Amino acid sequence: MTDPPAVSDLASWPTHRWEDVLARVRALVPPTPCVRFPDLGACYGGDIALKLENLQRTGSFKVRGAISKLTALGPEARSGGVVACSSGNHGRAVAWVAGELDVPATIFVPEWVDPVKLAGMREDGADVRLVGTSYDEAAAAAHQEVQRTGRPFVHPFDDVDVAAGQGTVALEILEVVPDVRHVIVCLSGGGLAGGVAAALRAHGSDAEVVAVSAERARVMFESLKAGRPLELEEESTIASALSGGIELENRVTFDLVRRHVDRHVVVEEAAIERAMGIAARHLHLVVEGGGAVGLAALFEGLLPAEDRAGPTVVVVSGGNVDATRLAEIVTRA
């Protein structure tokens, strides 16, 4: 694989390059709603809107990066098929986009992958292979497949095209809330947080970007504190979409997040579960654990109104959650 463009290029892209990515994304999926919730403002202070990526095709923001990468590859490069690894949502996204483009997709996932996400991948025609008990084991198997077959690898986060695709979330936010002052996003591998921050900077916005990590999926958070990518043992978490490492040889997203994300907070498992329950019971939104971390930070008072002057947008990044499990959470909310 060739080295990606310099990280600085992504944040300093001219707007027409971002518009090209957005056009390719919109050729396959429409914009998701960005909706103001006055009741949230009344409870937690300020002007609060939610960017509802849980309503996205395949149930998460990940479809944006998959579209950006697969269309950037071009018909010839992708004709023999692509390989991906995923803890769930990226796999669903690649499976669906590959199906739309008539491209074979082989996707490696850990054995604990959410059954809803696994079913979605298979329904969209992907060759899904369950490998190991961690995301990193599945990733290692995917890289072996790439070496064996020579097929392009669609990285779940550490790729300029993927991060740019995720950054189109910010472009749609600016269309609806052009004066946004704070954008709250989940943080795992850094594709969404880094892409959103870079897109905002490229469009002249100095909105604060707040990245929220799950307590049991905090590799990027700890890596940033250490000043270099780290490896941590994976832990079981309700925010399974945020599981996995960031790779010791991370070439794109670590620097994107380090340079352009302004603030970091960490939320506990119980807070994530409470946020899922509140979203379902009071906002009538189906939100998975990884998609609820931004709401959890808001609900738990980690982002008080006095620290949020001007409009705030929380990115609800995904909604792929088992109905039975969500019902149990709602009962406890």
Predicted regions and their residues:
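PLP-dependent amino-acid enzyme catalytic core
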Residues: 1-333
